[in-house]
């Protein structure tokens, strides 16, 4: 819709939605000097965690480390509000190590609101955004502002949509439903239609959340306790953000034969299995009924009981989301050991909502159809706070650069999980909620959480998101790591040293004369912590320095090989494709490739190669066509020959 009413107020950037993507986008744009406004339906539910009150986990923790390395805030908030932390996959290699923190959800939201309120250049507004104002240009529409439910118009040079599950949101308990973005909060009206009027395609997805149970009604003493085991690990690379508060335990129970029978008997009462809705749900976070159907041979499934905060009795029943009616939900809960007397405080529900398939976006997260309009978070088809926060930061950076007339920042797939995720989103026709996984990256040994600062903090500094203090911390850490690696490569443990027998026994290998500490670390089962225990390393050296030096040394051969692979792939995959390339006119491409390439308009050869339906033969044909055009462009005119 064209701007027909004088704006009530004007900003450089408007962010629509106050979830994890919106907060990250708004703070980023404001810190880059843009006059920014964050519009949200409910200022009391800023950065709410409507599902699991947790941050991190496999691949997700790497995303959080990356956002922090660039100057984002999700890692700082998670460190400041953590009530339990664990290292997942600790027995495996560093490529899949993952920090996961249970957070105090109310404290997390409160601290984010405080941060927003004290960020210069950032205004907060509570309103429902229902329309998008645009201005026609020669070749496409340009965003010029937003319109609210009550008719106010706000001008902006860039708008970032981060509406989460609120566009056309509808929550379901059994076959009963109501319009809502999540329990207790109204859905957003009008914005889906506004996008469709501008020519965007929308579709529907589904997600869900389990019931909340009163802690006081659970026999926790009968259940397996899962205490915190990573109090000295943090998401942020900034020690000023580290908080070591009182930790709380989680507990583990399991489904029973009674649980499974109840579910099988009542499947038809869910909205999905009853045929009421057909929206796709998240593959990697299935409902309990999906688990029973998909894994019919399993007698039992593990269920985690996770506290939602220090000052609330609410327990999140992880692994037990369901779309069954409320009375049956209570029966299901009471079929679990330790929950025979469970009091259900909030029922489980599923929510289906409108989303914007992300093939309509550029890698900068700007829409292809409307200049200055960006989209981030669950609206793009992702699931998870971490995925949302990462997209929010990217959209905030690129909205600021759009206004400043600068080239957008593109995150290459091989350089970060952020890049992997965005490349997947804009290249693949995804029709189910997307979550980041370590298996999605071909370069996961390089893309670890511990080295996210080394990969991305220089970029954050160049962008203006890393201040002098953070930069000095980063440089100090690099210098300390280099000194420690040099020490490990030069200091030798002699067979005659007092600790040598104990080291030989632990590693199961003899020391022949002497061995450098670096070679000792390369032995299976020997770690930096063991060097400290044997007095071979300084216990006062910061843990990130010790662990980073160990990984660099222990896996040096693998790291070098993977870096060589990355460099080789870069040379070809980062070749730019012309924005106006007419794929329909390239006869050597298959019909499907012409259609897919023309629809998605990839920006690089690498992105083109990852589009489903585009074969390696098509990429070869495209490369040959580009080379031919390049030679033709370089050839002298016929009359000059």
Curated annotation (Swiss-Prot):
PROSITE patterns: GIDA_1 (PS01280), GIDA_2 (PS01281). Belongs to the MnmG family. NAD(+) binds at residues 281-295. It comes from the Bacteria. Keywords: Cytoplasm, FAD, Flavoprotein, NAD, tRNA processing. One of its GO terms (molecular function) is flavin adenine dinucleotide binding. This is tRNA uridine 5-carboxymethylaminomethyl modification enzyme MnmG. GO terms for cellular component: cytoplasm. NCBIfam families: mnmG_gidA. FAD binds at residues 17-22. The keyword NAD applies. NAD-binding protein involved in the addition of a carboxymethylaminomethyl (cmnm) group at the wobble position (U34) of certain tRNAs, forming tRNA-cmnm(5)s(2)U34. The gene is mnmG. Homodimer. Heterotetramer of two MnmE and two MnmG subunits. The keyword Cell division does not apply.
